[in-house]
From Swiss-Prot:
SMART domains: IG
GO molecular function, one term: signaling receptor binding
Claim: Glycoprotein is one of the keywords in the record: yes
Every Ig-like V-type domain range: 35-144, 153-241
Name under which the protein is recorded: V-set domain-containing T-cell activation inhibitor 1
Processing and modification events after translation: N-glycosylated.
GO biological process per UniProt: adaptive immune response; negative regulation of apoptotic process; negative regulation of T cell activation; negative regulation of T cell proliferation; positive regulation of interleukin-2 production; positive regulation of T cell proliferation; regulation of cytokine production; response to protozoan
Disulfide bonds: C56-C130, C168-C225
InterPro entries given in the database record: BTN3A2-like_Ig-C, Ig-like_dom, Ig-like_dom_sf, Ig-like_fold, Ig_sub, Ig_V-set, IgSF_BTN/MOG
Main function: Negatively regulates T-cell-mediated immune response by inhibiting T-cell activation, proliferation, cytokine production and development of cytotoxicity. When expressed on the cell surface of tumor macrophages, plays an important role, together with regulatory T-cells (Treg), in the suppression of tumor-associated antigen-specific T-cell immunity. Involved in promoting epithelial cell transformation.
Coiled coil (UniProt feature): none
């Protein structure tokens, strides 16, 4: 049989938990009075000097005038971009983004809140939040945006050298990448001793041109020039035969993927209330 002290102790605990649950419920309903919706962002990378896209999707809503899209950046006061009542509202936009942002207005009703960012800069890197408010509810998700430079490599045969060689060039990379060569015939071979790689700073003093030369190549073989940093990986392939030269290039952005977020404050409140009921039965 429980002592008087134990009864008082559990009574106090029950009251605290019930009050906590009630507060959470009040906050949850007070903030929105609606359900929370799913918002999904996609981690992506921006190429310096070019236009980029910060991807964000949400549950579609045909009531365009009731949709509010806000983009925020960690460490920046003001908004990156705001769209509401069917049009842009840039009255609170931070100056570093002026004239550089736009949403895909004709795709908002189908759930596209992606942000177009013009003339990507190194300083655009960081954590962004895509915040959505519709007639169905509200939600948000974070996005990690990396900035750098990356480009396709081009491989050519250098017939002017004393022995046949391959020259791999890529015009713009940042941060400085690693470069490696591979051969279809000599798989696993280390070509570092028969290749030479250099980096030349471009005129804007940020990005660099990558040049790598592979010596003593043989015909009827396929060689690959691989350039990679923490943002992207590019591969250029070349096949040299007696009669022709075949080339192929591809570029892959690294560490890209979805980041869904579903808020559920109300559920937490009900969980606390359920716990308090269990304790009251003790």
């Amino acid at each position: 049989m429980a002592s008087l002290g134990q009864i008082i102790f559990w009574s106090i605990i029950n009251v605290i938990i019930i009050l906590a649950g009630a507060i959470v419920l009040i906050i949850g309903f007070g903030i929105s009075g609606k359900h929370f919706i799913t918002v999904t962002t996609f981690t992506s990378a921006g190429n310096i000097g070019e236009d980029g896209t910060l991807s964000c999707t949400f549950e579609p809503d045909i009531k365009l005038n009731g949709i509010v899209i806000q983009w925020l950046k960690e460490g920046i006061k003001g908004l990156v971009h705001e769209f509401k009542e069917g049009k842009d509202d840039l009255s609170q936009q931070h100056e570093m983004f002026r004239g550089r942002t736009a949403v895909f207005a004709d795709q908002v009703v189908v759930g596209n809140a992606s942000l177009r960012l013009k003339n990507v800069q190194l300083t655009d890197a960081g954590t962004y939040t895509c915040y959505i408010h519709t007639s169905k509810g509200k939600g948000n998700a974070n996005l990690e945006y990396k900035t750098g430079a990356f480009s396709m490599p081009e491989i050519n045969v250098d017939y002017n050298a004393s022995s046949e060689s391959l020259r791999c060039e890529a015009p713009r990379w940042f941060p400085q990448p690693t470069v490696a060569w591979a051969s279809q015939v000599d798989q696993g071979a280390n070509f570092s001793e028969v290749s030479n790689t250099s980096f030349e700073l471009n005129s804007e003093n940020v990005t660099m041109k990558v040049v790598s030369v592979l010596y003593n190549v043989t015909i009827n073989n396929t060689y690959s020039c691989m350039i990679e940093n923490d943002i992207a990986k590019a591969t250029g392939d070349i096949k040299v035969t007696d009669s022709e030269v075949k080339r192929r290039s591809q570029l892959e952005l690294l560490n890209s993927g979805p980041s869904p977020c579903v808020s559920s404050v109300s559920a937490a409140g009900w969980a606390l209330l359920s716990l308090s009921c269990c304790l009251m039965l003790r």
